[in-house]
């Protein structure tokens, strides 16, 4: 269920941020910012539905998913596949996100 929230949130954030990248770094039209801003608003709204107990933890857990989605974006949209170090680093981040989300708080 969590993937149904965090994956669309990541796509919305990456799309929104990429619109600024495209405008500034790739010299695209400033009109790219209009859907980009809408995407960033969607991202912020989606994260408010996180099951985490507070915003900071929601963002921390989301960060692991964001890293995976960013690597997929780089691969599929920008034609730059991840190398083994990218994948190892992403795996560590997912483990960290899982610990933050699911480990008992009584320790």
Curated annotation (Swiss-Prot):
It is a multi-pass membrane protein. Keywords: Cell inner membrane, Cell membrane, Membrane, Transmembrane, Transmembrane helix. Disulfide bonds: none annotated. The keyword Acyltransferase does not apply. Signal peptide: none annotated. It is found in: Cell inner membrane. The chain crosses the membrane at residues 4-24, 29-49, 55-75, 84-104. Pfam families: UPF0060 (PF02694). GO terms for cellular component: plasma membrane. Belongs to the UPF0060 family. NCBIfam families: PRK02237.1 (NF002586). This is UPF0060 membrane protein ZMO1566. It comes from Zymomonas mobilis subsp. mobilis (strain ATCC 31821 / ZM4 / CP4).
């Amino acid at each position: 269920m969590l993937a149904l929230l965090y994956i669309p949130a990541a796509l919305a954030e990456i799309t929104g941020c990429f619109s600024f990248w495209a405008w500034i770094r790739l010299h695209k039209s400033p009109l790219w910012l209009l859907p980009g801003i809408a995407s960033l608003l969607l991202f912020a709204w989606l994260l408010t539905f996180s099951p985490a107990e507070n915003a900071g933890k929601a963002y921390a857990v989301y960060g692991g998913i964001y890293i995976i989605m960013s690597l997929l974006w780089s691969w599929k949209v920008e034609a730059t596949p991840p190398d083994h170090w990218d994948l190892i680093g992403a795996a560590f981040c997912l483990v960290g996100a899982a610990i933050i989300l699911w480990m008992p708080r009584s320790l």
